Every structure is written in C-alpha cells, then in structure tokens.
C-alpha cells in the first residue's frame, strides 16, 4: 500500500495518476478513519496494489494514521508513505496560475495573496506530524512528467530494503526540502572556471577527469562514503524506507553532479539507489 499526503498544490493528484498507471487501485481523499477497514476489505478480495491519498481537509483525523500504519505493518501489509512538498513561493504561483482556492483560505479577505500565504503556512503546521513520518518529495522544481517518473521509480524499489536517493542541487536555488542529509561541496575546485569545461556537466568524462585529479575531491567522496557506511545500518534499524542525501555546489552543474554520480555508483552495488540532478532535470 502507498499512502500519499502533502501540501495542497504539491502534485498529489499527479502522483496518484502515476500510481494508477503503474497498476495501483487508487482512492483519493479517503477519510483517515476508514484507512484500516478499507485495507482489510481490499485484502478480502486477494492482495492487490492500493494507493490512497489524504489531504489537509482530514487534518483533525490525520493523527490516527501513524498508529493505523503500524497496525497494518504488523499484519504483514507493506506500507510506503510519501509526503509531497514544495516551497511557499512555488505553491503560491501554482494556485495563482490555476486560480484555484486553497482548501484553508478565506475567500472573504481583501488581500488574497496574504490569505493564500497564511493558508499555506497553516497547512504546513497541521501536516507537520505526517511529514515527519513520511518520505518527503520536494516538487518545487520538477515538472509533472518528472514527478510521475520519480514516483514510479520509488515504488519500484525493493520495499523491505532501505533505498538511497542521491540528489545534486545548487545552493543559490535553495536546499531541497526532501533532504535528510546535506553536504556542501562549494569549497572544491570548480570546473566552471575552466573555459573548456564550463558548458559541460558532472556527468561528462572531461569534468570527471578534472575533479578526480584533485585530492580534496577524492577526500570529500571518501568522507561522505564513510559517514553513510557508518550510519546506514542504524537507519535500517529505525525502519527507514528512504534516505535522501543532497549534495550541493554553487550551480548544481559540475561538482555536486559528479559526486552524486560517483556515490550512486558506489552504494548501488549494495543498496537500492536512485539519483536526481535537480538543476539539470529542471532544464
């Protein structure tokens, strides 16, 4: 079973459609009180893949969900909980473009922009506990098609194992909201200042050759690798399904991309591993 919650405007419907395309039986806006009975009813008809979406309109009942999920897991149900998020600026823009009213917004307020921002911040507060107990997906800078592909890749990972997600990003565009660990690599030599490398990315061999020729780059890779090696088993014992490791540099094009590629290759030999290049994927 996949449970999708998150901020209004973050792409929950897009994620649910992706799961429907992947063969899941999908239910939108299921009241939290019906979660356990619904799953039990589904299992009477034989095991099948189920995806359920809940939103802030069920906020008063959402505190019931974590206990229900634990009960389902104790009964042998495989549960994946995803929380979709985006920064406030992005959510405001999306609501403005679609001219939709936020579920918590007051329509009788003169300053509609302020009312929308207040509604978003209230929603963050109401959904805080669910966010803490779920794998967070930051949709601020990805298109609907990219979100669909990413959701499908997440659910395709072996459920009983910890899945590592390595993500490159540019600090100038903000730290990803879904990051569990953030490593700053802006102190490393920057290929941007090499005319022959500026237009390339960390996926290109010439950039990789340039970076691995510097001892500090190799030291950074080994330090991150050692840190993760030390703590991954503790995360498994904590019943984590996903861990997102974000690597940031100035532009999100060279250094962070190179290290994400290298880390994904290294850890992919032992763990289910996914990788994202936020700035490159954004085009």
UniProtKB/Swiss-Prot annotation:
Please name the GO terms that the record assigns under molecular function: ATP binding; GTP binding
Naturally occurring in which organism (per UniProt): Polaromonas sp. (strain JS666 / ATCC BAA-500)
Keyword entries, A-Z: ATP-binding, GTP-binding, Nucleotide-binding
Described purpose of this protein according to its UniProt entry: Displays ATPase and GTPase activities.
Q: What is this protein called?
A: Nucleotide-binding protein Bpro_1300
Entry's transmembrane regions: none
**Chain positions recorded as ATP binding sites:** 6-13
For the ligand (GTP), the binding residues are 55-58
